[in-house]
């Protein structure tokens, strides 16, 4: 329901929340469907270009973001396990980790204020 309030009522979202015993940090498994087929390397490159997003995705080294390593004490959002969905060529799976205290609350408020000041609202 939050996604509909923030973005658009027509976005199809099927969220599931799971609480696990970690001190800080949120992690999400995200499934996305697009209109066209997705090139995984292009998706990784696009994510890497965004300020505040760090891609950690090395299947050979079994390297991906975790709440323990990446979910606290930093402003970045960490994305890994980027792969095509098994059922559709136009789907994508991601694993996302962030410090919910910093990125989820405090930093987002500051970034919104900076954007408002920058746009002279």
Please state what every model-predicted region is:
Residues 1-93:
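C-terminal substrate-binding/catalytic lobe of Rossmann-fold NAD(P)-dependent oxidoreductases
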Residues 76-121:
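NAD(P)-dependent Rossmann-like dehydrogenase/reductase catalytic/cofactor-binding core
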């Amino acid at each position: 329901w939050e996604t509909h309030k923030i973005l658009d009522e027509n976005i199809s979202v099927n969220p599931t929340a799971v609480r696990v015993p970690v001190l800080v940090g949120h992690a999400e498994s995200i499934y996305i469907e697009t209109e066209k087929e997705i090139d995984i390397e292009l998706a990784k490159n696009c994510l890497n270009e965004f300020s505040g997003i760090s891609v950690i995705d090395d299947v050979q080294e079994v390297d991906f973001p975790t709440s323990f390593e990446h979910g606290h004490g930093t402003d970045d959002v960490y994305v890994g396990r980027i792969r095509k969905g098994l059922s559709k060529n136009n789907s994508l799976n991601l694993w996302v980790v962030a410090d919910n205290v910093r990125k989820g609350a405090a930093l987002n408020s500051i970034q919104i204020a900076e954007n408002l000041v920058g746009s002279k609202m």
